[in-house]
């Protein structure tokens, strides 16, 4: 393992030429080794010396280029760690930090807390340590119980980098006050990269302000950090910005549905037990479907070809009638039912030609959801998604998939699967509420 290429150094130099001294962000040595796959009998410890040399060389190059800080992201530290994991982490950074010279190194963690290694982290020669105070359930407790080194800077992740809601200044400033009372040198930070939220709220022009005034996308979160910095240095409780923020959390329009609340409250443990028992269900199913020992089927969604997308876009823009839209999809379903029968599949699917996205489609069928125009986020690679927003209590007013499945079943004597995205996936692929628990939101869905 060695340094290859010059991309991070070129980008740093490009920004510096524009008068901007950036903080390079690199995936950390420990997380890198834990996520690699090894061949044969090789293991992470076999590459420790090479990785130490590579990362030390990286720090040397950034220092020569004029970088004041270099950030190493170590999200793997929030996992359950073994003693061997902690020993590897210490070995790596004892070696790397010994070569850091005059430059400053920030260790950044996110998506959890570092309860298994807090003492090990703070004992090493990092200049700054970034901790997630939102998803890190024990982060505040760890700092309060163990203290924080006076020779280091705490980068406190207090603005949510994963969700689109405005920060609750009152709660955030309480944490900042507690840290300042311990004479901890604090830098306000997001809980993680802003990669997970849309770019800016400026592009959202159709949603009413009564909703959007509760949102903060990436640009707005940067503004929140700046505003929180100012508030943290004054008697903020009578400050206009603080009071305006507090008023947002006093009201939340169109949010509560009493029927949904009552239904969720009535859920009992026995509701999660399927009846009849598995053996009885299995016997009934075998008799009903008469499938072979190894039946064949597909996941369910077939290619969203250009004509399928064109049909959906035309419907959304009002260029075609609902009847024309449905008729097009029915022809597609019929075409692919025939293909599946000719191939000889045993359990068929209708192809999901009506679905723009496996989550957004269902959100559009449910009350309690909001939909943005341009709030895109990266899913993977070049693929982006536009997650729906769970605004209020979620309910279903009518069947979501029945008509399509009934039509598809009418075309064949073979079993036709009905397909729905499950509630956990729908929740995790949406921007969830923060005023109720994820458990309650899941139960509602």
Report residues per predicted region.
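Domain-level signal for soluble alpha/beta catalytic cores
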Residues: 1-445
């Amino acid at each position: 393992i060695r340094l290859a290429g010059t991309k991070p150094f070129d980008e740093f130099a490009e920004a510096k030429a524009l008068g901007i001294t950036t903080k390079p962000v690199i995936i950390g040595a420990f997380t890198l080794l834990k996520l690699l796959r090894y061949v044969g009998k090789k293991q992470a410890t076999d590459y420790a010396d090479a990785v130490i040399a590579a990362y030390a060389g990286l720090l040397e190059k950034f220092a020569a280029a004029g970088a004041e800080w270099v950030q190493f992201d170590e999200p793997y530290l929030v996992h359950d760690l073994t003693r061997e994991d902690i020993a590897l982490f210490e070995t790596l950074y004892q070696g790397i930090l010994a070569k850091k010279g005059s430059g400053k190194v920030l260790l950044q963690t996110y998506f959890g807390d570092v309860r298994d290694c807090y003492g090990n982290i703070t004992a090493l020669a990092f200049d700054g340590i970034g901790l997630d105070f939102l998803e890190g359930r024990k982060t505040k407790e760890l700092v309060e119980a163990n203290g924080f080194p006076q020779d280091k800077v705490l980068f406190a992740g207090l603005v949510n980098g994963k969700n689109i809601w405005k920060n609750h200044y009152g709660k955030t400033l309480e944490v900042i006050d507690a840290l300042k009372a311990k004479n901890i040198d604090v830098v306000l930070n997001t809980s993680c990269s802003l990669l997970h939220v849309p770019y800016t709220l400026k592009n959202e022009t159709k949603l009413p302000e009564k909703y959007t005034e509760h949102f903060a996308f990436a640009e707005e979160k940067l503004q929140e950090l700046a505003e929180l910095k100012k508030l943290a240095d004054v008697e903020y409780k009578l400050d206009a910005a603080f009071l305006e923020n507090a008023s947002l959390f006093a009201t939340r329009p169109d949010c509560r549905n009493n029927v949904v609340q009552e239904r969720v409250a009535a859920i009992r443990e026995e509701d999660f037990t399927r009846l009849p028992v598995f053996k009885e269900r299995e016997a009934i199913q075998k008799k009903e479907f008469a499938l072979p020992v190894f039946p064949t089927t597909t996941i369910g969604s077939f290619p969203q070809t250009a004509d399928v997308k064109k049909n959906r876009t035309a419907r959304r823009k009002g260029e075609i009638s609902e009847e024309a839209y449905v008729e097009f999809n029915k022809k597609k379903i019929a075409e692919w039912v025939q293909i599946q029968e000719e191939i000889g599949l045993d359990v068929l699917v209708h192809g999901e030609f009506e679905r723009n996205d496996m989550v957004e489609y269902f959100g559009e069928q449910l009350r309690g959801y909001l939909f943005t125009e341009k709030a895109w986020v990266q899913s993977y690679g070049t693929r982006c998604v536009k997650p729906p927003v769970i605004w209020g209590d979620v309910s279903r007013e009518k069947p979501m998939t029945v008509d399509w499945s009934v039509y598809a079943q009418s075309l064949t004597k073979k079993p036709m699967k009905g397909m729905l995205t499950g509630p956990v996936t729908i929740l995790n692929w949406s921007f969830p509420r923060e005023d109720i628990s994820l458990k309650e939101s899941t139960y509602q869905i």
